[in-house]
Design a protein with these regions (language model features):
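Active-site His/acidic residue clusters
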Residues: 2-49, 87-93
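C-terminal cap/loop subdomain of S1 sulfatases and analogous C-terminal strand-loop tails that border
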Residues: 86-111, 126-131, 135-141, 145, ...
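Active-site-proximal beta-strand/loop segments in catalytic clefts of secreted hydrolases
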Residues: 18-22, 30, 81-84, 114, ...
Length: 220
């Protein structure tokens, strides 16, 4: 917070990367919210997981309130996403549980192990804001085209109107059209996941997804 406050006071842009560890094993309950879930019937571990999700949500809410209080919410882009498939203690690696309605969970070869939540929004939408006019984001919309973490770097550069260093190879692409709720026919629709190094809730595998199709190859 101190670094952001300093940047705001100096009229400089800032970048904050906030990685929550809370929604991760071991699932130690956040006791601020435990009473809300004690009669869920889902078991102690699942109840603990739910409190961690709510705690993370509270943390993000606090951050957004800080941006509002500092008067920079309209100028701040928030990208909220997971780093892997769901890991809630609900069902096994190949079940429709922690990532329902997707099958599988963290470490599995199924969509529930690969696809993650990804929300992009201005902290305070304002159609008249000069930054939001240059980089509009559709509200209350779901984008079905895929994006990956590799797309974040070129997207952030685009928002900031910064060009990458000359001869610097980019693996990703700007998500601007996708954020607008439009189809980007130039955006890649294939994705390769190569995981033959060791077992983590699944077999040794490689998966390749193209459009609505997915190929899974098992090494044994």
């Amino acid at each position: 917070e101190a670094e952001m406050t300093k940047a705001i006071q100096e009229g400089k842009p800032f970048y904050l990367n906030m990685s929550h560890y809370a929604v991760h094993q071991p699932f130690e309950a956040d006791h601020r919210y435990l009473d809300k879930y004690k009669d869920s019937g889902k078991g102690h571990m699942a109840e603990a997981f739910a409190t961690l999700v709510e705690g993370m949500d509270k943390s993000l809410g606090d951050l957004m309130q800080y941006l509002e209080d500092q008067g920079v919410a309209e100028n701040t882009l928030i990208l909220f996403l997971g780093d892997n498939g769901g890991d809630a203690p609900l069902g096994g690696p190949a079940d429709y549980g922690s990532s329902a309605p997707l099958r599988g969970k963290k470490g599995s070869e199924y969509e529930g192990g690969v696809r993650v939540p990804f929300i992009a929004a201005w902290a305070k939408p304002d159609a008249k804001n000069k930054f939001q006019k240059k980089y509009p984001i559709a509200q209350n919309a779901v984008q079905l085209q895929q994006g990956t973490v590799m797309d974040l770097y070129p997207t952030i550069l685009s928002v900031a109107h910064v060009k990458p260093p000359k001869h610097y190879a980019l693996d990703g692409a700007d998500l601007k059209k996708l954020f607008q709720g439009k189809e980007d026919k130039k955006h890649r629709d294939d994705f390769l996941m190569h995981f033959p190094h060791g077992e983590h809730r699944a077999n040794y595998f490689t998966t390749y997804r193209k459009g609505d199709w997915k190929l899974i190859y098992y090494y044994h």
